[in-house]
Structure formats: structure tokens, C-alpha cells
Amino acid sequence: MASSASSLHFLSLTPQTLPLPKPTSQTTSLSFFSLPPSSLNLSLSSSSSCFSSRFVRKVTLSDFDQIEDVEDGDDGVEEERNFSPDLKIFVGNLPFSADSAALAELFERAGNVEMVEVIYDKLTGRSRGFGFVTMSSKEEVEAACQQFNGYELDGRALRVNSGPPPEKRENSSFRGGSRGGGSFDSSNRVYVGNLAWGVDQDALETLFSEQGKVVDAKVVYDRDSGRSRGFGFVTYSSAEEVNNAIESLDGVDLNGRAIRVSPAEARPPRRQF
């Protein structure tokens, strides 16, 4: 009887211990696959300020197994800072429906895409119509500019360029001087400071054109290095547009920096002797 009881007791334990690994495995699997969506949503969610939708290489909706490459938002920001400014491309005249993932898919035809940013309005949550693409090499940057400048995406011809084009800067400055007089009144001019190094005239004009008619937009560059000095000026056609721009855009996040927008101080005219 004792032997029989011992046998029965042993058999009763077996079905209890065998299923234990199964629920543990299922629980681990479920929690693993639930992590990537929440992590991705953190980088794509809107905030009270202007925000951007980012696509970072190796972090895609399907690559769940590579989510460990980016553990939190700080790592992604640090990786972005390490990218050379020469590898960043400005993409303007974007359709409002184009997000960072769509832009990344398009530019991957020209090479390896490291990161994509689409800039969104802080109040409406809608795209501002421009963004930035970071490639892996200068050759890929040139290929992307040649391939996609003027490329029609959802009915809109993209404006694609990289770096500060010297010819365009000179033309912009000359155009501003030639427009002197009432239409280029310095009282209708705003100063824009704390600009990210990758922001050029096109990005500045696209952003400020939402508040009125932009007569001139200029980013100031260093003569020796050709790099942005981190500030610029935008001229409107009326004082009302200037006030709208200051109220709406001062403190807005543009490419990772909160820009400063204020009335530009008028310079005394130069006298020729």
C-alpha cells in the first residue's frame, strides 16, 4: 500500500511540473513583442511644442529584434549629433501626408539612410512641408540630390539640396539689396537665432511663409568656412506678418533647437565717402 501510494503521489506531481515552462515562455514572448511599438511611439508622438517624426536606421516597424540597438531617446540624439552636417539633406515642398518612414523609403533608392526628420506644427500636428534626410556618405548625398530634386511625390515637386550653396547665398543677399525701398523695410524684418547648422534659406522660408508673405529669407554664413553661423533674418511685406511670426514661431523647435525670433534691429545706412 505504501508503495502504491508513493507511486500515485509521484504521478500526480508530473502533470503539475510539465506545463510550467510553457506559460513562462508565452509570457516572455508576449512581453518581448509588446516592447517595440511602445518604444517607437515615444519618438513619433506629438508634444505641446513643435516636434518631428524621426526614422532612424535599424529601428523600423518590422525590425523588432533590433530594438535593443536604441534603448532610449538619448542614445538616438547622441547618434544624430555624431553625423557630419555634410551628410544632411534638406527636403522641401513635401506633401502633408508624407511622414518620416515614407521619406526614408524613397531616399533609400539613393543609398543608406541613417536618419529622417519631418517637421510638424506644434499646434495642429500637421507637417510643415519640409524635413531632413541624413545619408551615410557624401556620394550618396550627391546621388540623392540629383535623383530627387524636382521629383514629384504625391503631386508635389520636391526641393532637395545639401549644405549651404554659396551661389544661392550671394544671389539671396543681392536680391535683398536690390529690393530696397518700401517693400524691403527693415521694420518688417525679424531676427532668427539659435538655428541648427543644417537649416538653410529654403527651410527658413518654408517655416516663416506660414505666417505671411516672405520677401526675403537669409541665413548668415561664415566667409571662411562656409558654415552657418546659427542665425539669420526674414523680411515680411507688412508689420502685421512680423507680429504673427514672433508670436507663433518664437521658441519653436526647428531641427532640434528652439529658435529665437525677435524684431531685427535696424542698422544705420552706410555712407560712401
Curated annotation (Swiss-Prot):
Statement: the UniProt record of this protein carries the keyword Cell cycle: no
UniProtKB keywords: Chloroplast, mRNA processing, Plastid, Repeat, Ribonucleoprotein, RNA-binding, Transit peptide
Location of the transit peptide in the chain: 1-58
Residue ranges, annotated region (Linker (Gly-rich)): 166-187
Domain RRM per the UniProt entry, residue ranges: 87-165, 188-266
Alphabetized GO MF terms: mRNA binding
CDD domains: RRM2_NsCP33_like (cd21608)
Keyword Hydrolase in annotation: no
Compartments, record wording: Plastid, Chloroplast
PROSITE patterns associated with the record: RRM
Source species, domain of life: Eukaryota
One of the protein's GO biological processes: mRNA processing
InterPro entries listed in its UniProt record: Euk_RNA-bind_prot, Nucleotide-bd_a/b_plait_sf, RBD_domain_sf, RRM2_NsCP33-like, RRM_dom
The protein's role, per its UniProt record: Could be involved in splicing and/or processing of chloroplast RNA's.
Name used for this protein in its record: 29 kDa ribonucleoprotein A, chloroplastic
Source organism (scientific name): Nicotiana sylvestris (Wood tobacco)
